[in-house]
Amino acid sequence: MLYTISDLHLSLSTDKPMNIFKGWENHTQRIKSNWLRLVKDDDTVVLPGDFSWGLKLSETLEDFKFLEGLPGKKILLKGNHDLWWSTVKKVNEFFEQNNITSVSLILNNAIKVGDKTICGTRGWFYDESEDTKVRKREVMRLVRSLEQAQILGGEKVVFLHYPPVYGEYVCNDILAVLKQFNIDTVYHGHIHGSGYNSAVSEYDGIKFKLISADCIDFTPFFIV
């Protein structure tokens, strides 16, 4: 089975408690309890960003040990708060050094899971002129991921951290890529709390599902 949950905001190695935010009380234990109730060893869970508050890899170790201790394979994408994410090579070396064996990364690639192919990127949220470089980079990363998915075959399942549509904001560059590859559903995070009310569920024929942890009661969301 395939599940997803975004924005875990773990801080087991850092002093960044989430219980200062309404609704986030005891969130780590709630995630664990719900995960153990649903996810089996042969399942896969996609986590599209904001996994850990660690500022460097060494500050994420306890968070990754926590994740490693949960059943299933895990696929991570980068979020805006994942400042620990340096390069894929360095992160994979960190995993190897610390016996983190159930976690894979998506950045310019795609991963086949049964008859589904997981792809995506962080995305981008703003459209001001000074953000053009970053936005174009994220667009190309999404293109490369989707191209890799085509090579692997299977049904594409797309994850972004940032929603390409939110309130009155629309990232047309990202939407154009989704249209180009005939994507009809996107899973995303980033939005929290009352921001849920401005989340867009469908735009121009594409469905968007917000799966930030607090918006889905800290419970992995079942896809298929």
Region annotations inferred by a language model:
Residues 1-3:
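Extreme N-terminal starter segment of soluble prokaryotic enzymes
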Residues 8-15, 82-173, 177:
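Conserved catalytic scaffold of divalent metal-dependent phosphoesterases
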